[in-house]
Amino acid sequence: MMLQSIFLEPLFWGSILIISIQNLAHMTLEEIYFQEAVCVVIMLVIDIPTGALADIIGRKKMLVIGHVIGFTNFLFFAFMSEPWHTWVANILWSIGGAFRSGADKALIQESCIGLDKDKHYYRKYAGKASGLRFLMFGLCAPVASYLAEYNLRFPLLLSIPFLVIPLVTAFMLTEPPRDGVRELSVKDHLFQMKDGIIDTCKDKRILWIMLYLCVISASSKIWFFAYNPYFEHVGLPIRYFGWIFLVLNVIAWLSSQYGSKIEHKLGDKVTVHILIPLIGIPIIL
């Protein structure tokens, strides 16, 4: 699972993502934002039944399907030349992401339970995996920006072989036994989803948590999608994009390494409040 977490996203694309879509697919920034908003909604809708679907067909099969779809979506990005290519790619990204989210975290948590590990072990594992992914992104970013000076498509093509790694490892996973868990029919799962949605709508705390996550996610997306145009606006040559991305990802890597310890000391409530200015201030600046 660690390899899947590290190589989940294209390694050589992050530092030139927006500029490559603008130039290769001939899209404006406004069109990219609109497309992203539509696809996030699609992902949220599809994400609702994926947990139940993972219970029915199995976590491993869900992960395999998600990674196959994810690999296919990036092929559309790698060879994009028109806006509709990115529409297909992003819709596939939404579907693949929903399938993976319905299985990967549950599979890790069930494995932790099987190994008699507590919730802090899961947080530490998740932080370490995220940190290594940030570090890999950072180390690959300068290479990507230098290649992009010659051809914007080169970094995308270079990312393809690494996306095979999570796909192959998904086939090699062993799903832990779910002892004591009663198997439910499709009808039972549908009733559970209906009851879950009703209970969620009635619980103000859950609604506030969902709103908080939406705001944090949207703010992060805005920042991530705005840095390429900002670099261009201030006249920064593309070959330096990757070096700035390297610094940012090293900071993210260090934060992930010690994130679980900081969260454990500060507590969930304080950590949640600290995240708001940490994400909001950079956007304002």
Where are these regions (language model features)?
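Cytoplasmic membrane-interface "Motif A"-like loop-to-helix N-cap segments
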Residues: 56-67, 264-277
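Juxtamembrane intracellular "pre-TM" segments in multi-pass secondary transporters
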Residues: 175-211
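Helix-loop boundary and gating motifs at the non-cytosolic
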Residues: 1-45, 203-246
